[in-house]
Amino acid sequence: MITSSFSEKCTSVINGAPSWAVFFLFDLLDYFLCIVFRFLDEVMEEKSESCHCNNPREKTHFAEYEFLSETLYRRRNVFRQAGFLRFANKLPEITKKIGIVTFLRKFLFPHTMNKVSHEVANRWSDCGCKTCVSWINTDKLNVIVKQPSISDLSISNKPVENVIFVHGFLASSSFWTNTVFKYLPETTEGTNYRFFAIDLLGFGDSPKPRASQYSLKEHVEMIEKSVILPNNLTSFHVVAHSMGCIIGIALAAKFSDSVKSVALVAPPYFADSKGGASCAALDVVAKKKLWPPASFFTAMMCWYEHIGRGVCLVFCRHHRTWERIIKIVTWRRKLPTAIMDFTKHTHQSGWHSMHNVICGGAKFTDKHLETLIKSGVKINVMQGDKDVVVPIDCLSNMKGKFPAVEVEVIAGTDHSTVIMSRREVFAANLVSLWATSEKKQKV
């Protein structure tokens, strides 16, 4: 008891004045990197990439403006609020006038100066390896399908149940295919199952368009385009984890007459009763504090756009180098897919999905849940009691506002082990949920 109290006091001290000082320096560093990246973008690509340091009314070209999160522009920064950003806005014009950009381009890229510039798939700060840009040959998501053989389907007269699996942040379809899929039956005594595990837009092997805002609407439309329409799904179930829960709920709400059940694991739910749910979500999932280290890293990546881009430049762009180093250090010939998936995104896709889905999606979740409940869709939610990524309060708040939602707290598990440490049980629970969701009664 004394040890626990002492630990809490130490954490409180660390997250006090030192925390304020560190994040004040981060405000300065992010402002400095804003200038640096604007200059480098001009040199490397002949244009300065837009960032979210400006007021949205000053600079936004996104048609679906309501799907952008307020957190993109309302992140507090001492130097931005003091008006220091004016210099960063004028930098491209200044450097062009004095000829610095032209000189550097001639020096660095002498053979490309007279060529017509064109839009490339990836930014200069993103990885351009064959694997990372393989998506340019398709406009649909990468989808892994598990189903009975065609011969079995043709012989059997059993109905087919379709299930769409949606992964969470910084993950891919392998989150499901390498774990739960092994324990899910393709066929049971009375039903055939067809499972679809997708790589969300901007993650895994799916497209990562640099012009996309990775809004909730864009994610849902890509799933519709890549899974529902091509496979003519007239009925299906949804299973989602973490960030994928927000997308899964939105997808189910759009097709509420077709969805039979929704299974959510560790959903980042933030009620929008008073408005401003997006900013409230950011304050909860990425609270500015130094301890524990995971929380500090999350806060740094979520609050500071240009620091985050710098981190992606170091780790994601050079992921092959880091993978070789990890293999040498760990004596492994093959790395776990979770490590490989961690860098399978661009800064654009990671940053905007974090803000426009996890934070921005909060203002739509209540409406989507109401739609599902009115349509009689069975909603099952579970979360580990040791989850430090998504507060356990999210579960109780959802249950409090929507009593029809079935919730379950799994003792001794966290954000990922709630599935990973109990894969067989989790799979069995899913099959049971699907079997009892045959008929819907609208409320």
From Swiss-Prot:
Entry-linked Gene3D superfamilies: alpha/beta hydrolase
Biological process, per Gene Ontology: cell wall organization
Name of the protein this chain belongs to: Probable lysophospholipase BODYGUARD 5
GO CC term, one of those recorded: plasma membrane
Signal sequence segment: 1-52
Compartments, as annotated in UniProt: Cell membrane; Secreted, Cell wall
Bilayer topology: Lipid-anchor
EC annotation from Swiss-Prot or TrEMBL: 3.1.1.-
Lipid anchor positions (N-palmitoyl cysteine): C53
Short name of one Pfam family: Abhydrolase_1
Purpose: Involved in cuticle development and morphogenesis.
Residues forming the catalytic site: H167, S242, D387, H415
Gene Ontology terms for molecular function: hydrolase activity
Sequence ranges assigned to domain AB hydrolase-1 in this UniProt record: 163-268
This protein's UniProt keywords: Cell membrane, Cell wall, Cell wall biogenesis/degradation, Hydrolase, Lipoprotein, Membrane, Palmitate, Secreted, Signal
Main localization, broad class: membrane
